Amino acid sequence: MSSLRLLASAARRATTHVAYTRRGYAEISDKLKLSLALPHKAIFSSQDVVQVNIPAESGDMGILSSHVPSIEPLRPGVVEVVEDSGSQKWFVSGGFATVHPNNRLTINVVEAAPLEDFSIEAIRANLQEANKVAAGSGSEADKMEAQIEAEVYEALQHALAK
């Protein structure tokens, strides 16, 4: 065999034994990027968190990274933000949560405050007052407003009792 044929034969055998590396998927983040915003300020702005629990109208939901995209209306209740260092609880009056396909969660609410800022005694007193106005002889608008207040105070009282 000529040296050229021997070299060509060896080159063919060498290329058939090359290990091909398989192409894999991109790394998926195990964190969720949370944005929690009020009309006048942002509480969280694209902050990495482990999990967020929300009071959706359809029931309480826990949201992790890679959650199915959805839009959820929120009822008055507690939004719990779980981070590596612990968790924070915020009482929200209602709003919307949008789970985006790229591990982002946007929560827009009208009002929010840290749960520890509330006093159970003040909540009970305000709930009694709201129930009194709702059952009173005032205008229909006043009664409806008081009923909405009572619903929010009941949700807040329930959240503080946990």
UniProtKB/Swiss-Prot annotation:
Transmembrane segments annotated in the record for this chain: none
GO molecular function (one): proton-transporting ATP synthase activity, rotational mechanism
GO cellular component: mitochondrial inner membrane; proton-transporting ATP synthase complex
SUPFAM superfamilies from the UniProt entry: Epsilon subunit of F1F0-ATP synthase N-terminal domain
Transit peptide: 1-25
Keywords assigned: ATP synthesis, CF(1), Hydrogen ion transport, Ion transport, Membrane, Mitochondrion, Mitochondrion inner membrane, Transit peptide, Transport
Pfam families: ATP-synt_DE_N (PF02823)
UniProt xrefs under InterPro entries: ATP_synth_F1_dsu/esu, ATP_synth_F1_dsu/esu_N, ATPsynth_dsu/esu_N
Localization of this protein: Mitochondrion; Mitochondrion inner membrane
Entry's family note: Belongs to the ATPase epsilon chain family.
Subunit comment: F-type ATPases have 2 components, CF(1) - the catalytic core - and CF(0) - the membrane proton channel. CF(1) has five subunits: alpha(3), beta(3), gamma(1), delta(1), epsilon(1). CF(0) has three main subunits: a, b and c.
Its biological purpose: Mitochondrial membrane ATP synthase (F(1)F(0) ATP synthase or Complex V) produces ATP from ADP in the presence of a proton gradient across the membrane which is generated by electron transport complexes of the respiratory chain. F-type ATPases consist of two structural domains, F(1) - containing the extramembraneous catalytic core, and F(0) - containing the membrane proton channel, linked together by a central stalk and a peripheral stalk. During catalysis, ATP turnover in the catalytic domain of F(1) is coupled via a rotary mechanism of the central stalk subunits to proton translocation.
Protein name: ATP synthase subunit delta, mitochondrial
Organism: Agaricus bisporus (White button mushroom)
